[in-house]
């Protein structure tokens, strides 16, 4: 991967709203334009052609990344990983196969995002309260199975989760509202610069959702392991992990941390990756 292509992959580290707006300004290619550019890259190694192919598909990566919003991971990071998958797809795309790039690239984009989620999900799971995890993901899983609830399904879900029908409707509305916010165009007043984490749907402190949740000793042990593992990191790595993963109210972007430490965003990403690797090893030990 060239330095220019790496720069493209790290594009969402700044303001997410501005990035999405910029991604949507790049015109989509016709089948003929796409084939011509792909041939230049495939047969001549034309990097300008590769750049155009990538830029014209950035909006598609944003679309794919939105499907992973429920994992509590920063949207900018999901998009960044998806962009890496897009670049791998562009590099491997054979224009003679007879399919559009978007059909070929979707598998690479999802593969990179899947790997990122699997690498980081356990840390997020430990760092979020048990009540938030159980409530959000149980309801989200049920919605994936049933879609938008009718009244009978609302009552069934309420029985399954041990809550009232009113609570189910309220949570469903919050989840739908957050999805609508992400769907808004860059020209709308609403800002989608904040990552869509489970805590955003669960900040109503009057909710009685947590009343019937069972104790989970493994999670308590994992939380203790995380605390112990954090103490083994250097001060800068601790700060990066806290700012990126543990501060639910004000998560920092890679660029913000890069400015704080006077290094590149790529360097912060490397430090974060190394720290996360150490934390995972400690939790899984």
Swiss-Prot record:
Name of the featured protein: RNA polymerase sigma factor RpoH
Family membership noted in the UniProt record: Belongs to the sigma-70 factor family. RpoH subfamily.
A Pfam family annotated for this UniProt entry: Sigma70_r4
UniProt-annotated location(s): Cytoplasm
Residue spans binding DNA: 254-273
SUBUNIT field: Interacts with the RNA polymerase core enzyme.
Function per UniProt: Sigma factors are initiation factors that promote the attachment of RNA polymerase to specific initiation sites and are then released. This sigma factor is involved in regulation of expression of heat shock genes.
Chief localisation class: cytoplasm
Biological process annotations from GO: DNA-templated transcription initiation; response to heat
Renumbered residue ranges of the record's region Sigma-70 factor domain-2: 53-122
Short sequence motif named Interaction with polymerase core subunit RpoC, residue ranges: 77-80
InterPro entries: RNA_pol_sigma-70_dom, RNA_pol_sigma70, RNA_pol_sigma70_r1_2, RNA_pol_sigma70_r2, RNA_pol_sigma70_r4, RNA_pol_sigma_r2, RNA_pol_sigma_r3/r4-like, RNA_pol_sigma_RpoH_proteobac
Alphabetical list of NCBIfam families matching this protein: PRK06596.1, rpoH_proteo, sigma70-ECF
Entry's Gene Ontology cellular component terms: cytoplasm
């Amino acid at each position: 991967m060239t330095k220019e292509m790496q720069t493209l992959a790290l594009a969402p580290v700044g303001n997410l709203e501005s990035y999405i707006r910029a991604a949507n300004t790049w015109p989509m290619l016709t089948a003929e334009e796409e084939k011509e550019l792909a041939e230049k890259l495939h047969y001549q190694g034309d990097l300008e052609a590769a750049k155009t192919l990538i830029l014209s598909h950035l909006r598609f990566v944003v679309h794919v990344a939105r499907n992973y919003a429920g994992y509590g991971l920063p949207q900018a990071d999901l998009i960044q990983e998806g962009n890496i998958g897009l670049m791998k797809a562009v590099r491997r795309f054979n224009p003679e196969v007879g399919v559009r790039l978007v059909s070929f690239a979707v598998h690479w984009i999802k593969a990179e995002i899947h790997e990122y989620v699997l690498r980081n999900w356990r840390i997020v799971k430990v760092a979020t309260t048990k009540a938030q995890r159980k409530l959000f993901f149980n309801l989200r899983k049920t919605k994936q199975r049933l879609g938008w609830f009718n009244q009978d399904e609302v009552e069934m879900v309420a029985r399954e989760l041990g809550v009232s029908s009113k609570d189910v409707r309220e949570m469903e509305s919050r989840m739908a509202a957050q999805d609508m916010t992400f769907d808004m165009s860059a020209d709308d007043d609403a800002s989608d610069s904040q990552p869509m984490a489970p805590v955003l749907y669960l900040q109503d402190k009057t909710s009685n959702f947590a009343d019937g949740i069972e104790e989970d000793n493994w999670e308590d042990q994992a939380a203790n392991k995380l605390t112990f593992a954090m103490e083994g990191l250097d001060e800068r790595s601790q700060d990066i992990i806290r700012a990126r993963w543990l501060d639910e109210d004000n998560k920092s972007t890679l660029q913000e941390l890069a400015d704080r430490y006077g290094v590149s965003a790529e360097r912060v990403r490397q430090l974060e990756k190394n720290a996360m690797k150490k934390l995972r090893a400690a939790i899984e030990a």
